[in-house]
């Protein structure tokens, strides 16, 4: 099935004025093919039915991979990095390929964004931004790889000592459905840039854009076999990747329970693993905050992407002196948010990725209400007829008095914010840190010494002050506590796909004295 087979009605909603005909091969986006060891072939695994969450209609089907494909992909990946010379290619030569991948992504932003919007429901403005960010990631990694240096370390004898970095081999990349092209780029670009092969497993709910990225990598001149893309279920294909003895490292983004299970397997193999996991991030409004800025930032932080974001600022702590005024403003602004399909440029809150996920979010809210949470807005599936066919959920604000309520402790991964009052800094820090997660935090205040104090006191990998959900590929990203293990992005993120090696080179030109050879006796 191709994009154009979706019909004129769909195409009329693509607001770009550009053709959506694929630039490389007509219909390539939805070909029923997976990418194993440099070859496109029909999968023999279970059938994936891709549903447009704004209409409930199946727009494409794909046969997924099976465990045997993992063996093929890893074996070919190992050969490919060696035989193609990818691992030994000079950094500026690898960088040239990454630059071309970035340029091709940029040239195809509309194509990629449209594909991802159909697959995930997200707004086109968001999927365009994700595609541009993926291009920027490849360019950043290209520049960083080309300029990375090893070290000549201070010597303690007659030898030259060096610290160098080498590729690891084949990297397993396992990603979730919420921001596919950006998650892929964040893992695949540094892993390739470091000279590795990659076996990528995209999620069942959003496999297409990763397959499209593989076609772009092929066009950019990435040697055959260096990248494989194996869509399929996590419990079979994903599990086989993590357990495979030829996989040197796994980089995973997804839920905390899944990440913990993968970490056990990695421990058995003594294999490094990077985990980017779930969150329940606090966002904090002090009485001296610019309230317009805070309302806009908090809404963006929790309701953009329909709340399907690991860093969603889902616990909103408001100083008691402004609690009523601030919450009223937040509720009024939230009620005015525009719901609709991701293809409509007016849409702020698009459908959720899948009906079953929407229903889980709805059930969690219902349960919270039974346990005493008060619904300040939303709290239900919208009843507007125009939204009846999509996986929509109203942006919701719940009020609870106590951060120990289950709804304050569990990740919802939907458009649901919980407001809680606080009295002073120590009460706030105790409550904000009272969760198993430690991913992100937002602070809204004009008192900068206070912003500094609280930023240091909160257990989170990222803290935003008077802004939220802003990212830079050059700035490391990591989660504390149950939110993750290891770091992505930045130069350290690239190094995490390399083995460090120390080399000692003798400069004396003499046998070591201990051996007492004829010359030194
Ligand atoms: P998930 O854990 O269900 O799945 C993530 C990926 O892991 C999918 O590709 C899935 O098929 C695969 N998988 C599942 N079981 C597996 C197994 N046993 N072995 C190997 N692979 C397996 O998560 P999800 O529902 O796709 O994504 C939502 C979660 O991701 C949320 O918890 C969210 O917070 C988290 N997330 C975290 C970040 C971050 O950077 N910290 C970013 C985005 C999403």
Q: Where do the language-model regions lie?
A:
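Hydrophobic face of amphipathic alpha-helices that form TPR/SEL1-like repeat modules
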Residues: 2-55, 80, 380
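Short, well-ordered beta-strand elements within core beta-sheets of diverse protein domains
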Residues: 58-65, 82-86, 173, 283-286, ...
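Residue-level signal for inorganic ion chemistry
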Residues: 38, 56, 94, 116, ...
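ALDH superfamily catalytic-core signature
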Residues: 257-402, 465, 512-513, 519-521
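Rossmann-like NAD(P) dinucleotide-binding subdomain of oxidoreductase/dehydrogenase enzymes
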Residues: 149-293, 422
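Glycine-rich loop-to-alpha-helix module at the N-terminal edge of alpha/beta enzyme cores
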Residues: 59-148
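Structural signal for hydrophobic packing residues in well-ordered secondary-structure cores
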Residues: 81, 85, 102-109, 113, ...
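Conserved C-terminal structural/oligomerization subdomain of aldehyde/semialdehyde dehydrogenase
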Residues: 2, 55-60, 247, 284, ...
